[in-house]
Each structure stands twice: as C-alpha cells, then as structure tokens.
UniProtKB/Swiss-Prot annotation:
It comes from the Eukaryota. GO terms for biological process: asymmetric protein localization involved in cell fate determination; cell fate specification; determination of adult lifespan; embryo development ending in birth or egg hatching; establishment of mitotic spindle orientation; first cell cycle pseudocleavage; heat acclimation; maintenance of protein location in nucleus. One of its GO terms (cellular component) is nucleus. Keywords: Cytoplasm, Nucleus. Its main location: cytoplasm. Interacts with daf-16 and sir-2.1. Interacts with atgl-1. Interacts with hcf-1. Required to modulate lifespan, in concert with hcf-1, acting redundantly with 14-3-3-like protein ftt-2. It comes from Caenorhabditis elegans. It is found in: Cytoplasm; Nucleus. This is 14-3-3-like protein 1. InterPro entries: 14-3-3, 14-3-3_CS, 14-3-3_dom_sf, 14-3-3_domain. Belongs to the 14-3-3 family.
Length: 248
C-alpha cells in the first residue's frame, strides 16, 4: 500500500530533522508526482530538500576541481581527481534533471497564484544555473534556459508582487548572481541587485509582518553582494564562493 501525501510529508519532515536530505527529497518527489498543487509548506519542503541535496554536490565539485588544478604535474593524481569530479558532475546533473522534470511536468503548469509561478520559475532558473556551473558541451543552451526562466519569473513578479515580497527579492538575488557568475557581467548584476534593493527600501511600509525577517535578510544579502561586486568591478580573480544566494 502506497503512502498518503500526509505520511510522505511527515516522512520528509523527519528526514529534515535527521539531516537526511536525500530521503527528504525522495519523499517530496513522490508528493509532487501525485499531481496536486503543493501547499506552501510542501513547496518549501521540496525546495529545502533539493537545495541541500544539490548543494552538497556543488560544494564537493568546487573542492575536487580545485584539487584537480593543484595536481598539475602529477598525471596519476590529476587523472584520479578528474574521474572523481566527473562522478560528482553526473550526480549533480541527475539531481538537476530530476528537479527540472518535476517543475515542467507538475509544478509550473499547476501553479495558480503568481507567487507560486514565480517561486517555481525561479527554481527552474536556479537548477539550470547549477547545470551551467559544471556544463561544458551544451553550456550555451543551458545558460539560455536559465536566463529565460529567471526573466519570465521577474516579469511576473514585477507585475503581481510587492517589491518587499521575499520570493521577489530572492529571485532578484539569484538572478543577479547568475549575471555575475554565469554571464560574467558584473555591471548588469549590480544594476539588478541595486534596483531590487532600492525598490524594496522605497516600499518598506508594505513589509508583511509574517515575512519581515525573510525580506530583510535577503535585502541584507543583496547589499552584501553589491558591496562585494562594486569593489570587484575590474578585478578578475574574485572567489565566486563569496556570492550570497537565496535559500528557497
């Protein structure tokens, strides 16, 4: 007998508390595949699960890539590092494809409210961005898909959501990171981040009490990135790990 949605959600919550994010993602994938529109709680559980699952691989990939570069001159060590990097890349690729399939087949099409649509399109932009970080052959196509999803989300967010809404702010944060890291256009990244920050500051009185903490945190991250990027415009060797991203 298959688990009910309630049981799967409870399983996901248990897995989160135990920090077993692969189990959490597997449970929320099953919830999504039931074909019903997710509640806000379910949506956030899905996002947190996959963010942690993919985040672990992104972190591993960066470490291994760095080791691979440092082993130049030792052919055997470099080959071992390369093989391990390719293994992690495949895992990362599989996870991203899983998420993108859920988004295209279930989540985006079922999203009724503008908030949900923006959330899922931002997520689509994020996971294509993660693919772009490690892609080589089809990178241009992946980058284009990421930019298209982010832009569609931003168009809806600007039309339907307050500038202080945490999802709109998180979208601006991650889209600006995309411009900085993936397209290597710091001026565009700064412009997008500054616009989002300024728009939110101008409408601070619209801050929802429930999301006050989330909104102000993301505004701080936008400002942190702006500080980092404006000091870095013209410099070529900035470590990308310093760039802040939105959690969900």
């Amino acid at each position: 007998m298959s688990d009910t949605v309630e049981e799967l959600v409870q399983r996901a919550k248990l897995a989160e508390q135990a920090e077993r994010y692969d189990d959490m993602a597997a449970a929320m994938k099953k919830v999504t595949e039931q074909g019903q529109e997710l509640s806000n709680e379910e949506r956030n559980l899905l996002s947190v699960a996959y963010k942690n699952v993919v985040g672990a691989r992104r972190s591993s990939w960066r470490v291994i890539s760095s080791i691979e570069q440092k082993t130049e001159g030792s052919e055997k060590k470099q080959q071992l590092a390369k093989e391990y990097r390719v293994k992690v890349e495949q895992e990362l690729n599989d996870i991203c494809q899983d998420v993108l399939k859920l988004l295209d087949e279930f989540l985006i099409v079922k999203a009724g409210a503008a908030e949900s649509k923006v959330f899922y399109l931002k997520m689509k932009g994020d996971y294509y961005r993660y693919l772009a970080e490690v892609a080589s052959e089809d990178r241009a196509a992946v980058v284009e898909k990421s930019q298209k999803a982010y832009q569609e989300a931003l168009d809806i967010a600007k039309d339907k959501m307050q500038p202080t809404h945490p999802i709109r702010l998180g979208l601006a944060l991650n889209f600006s990171v995309f411009y900085y890291e993936i397209l290597n256009t710091p001026e565009h990244a700064c412009q997008l981040a500054k616009q989002a920050f300024d728009d939110a500051i101008a409408e601070l009185d619209t801050l929802n009490e429930d999301s006050y903490k989330d909104s102000t945190l993301i505004m701080q991250l936008l400002r942190d990135n702006l500080t980092l990027w404006t000091s870095d415009v013209g410099a070529e060797d900035q470590e990308q790990e310093g760039n802040q991203e939105a959690g969900n």
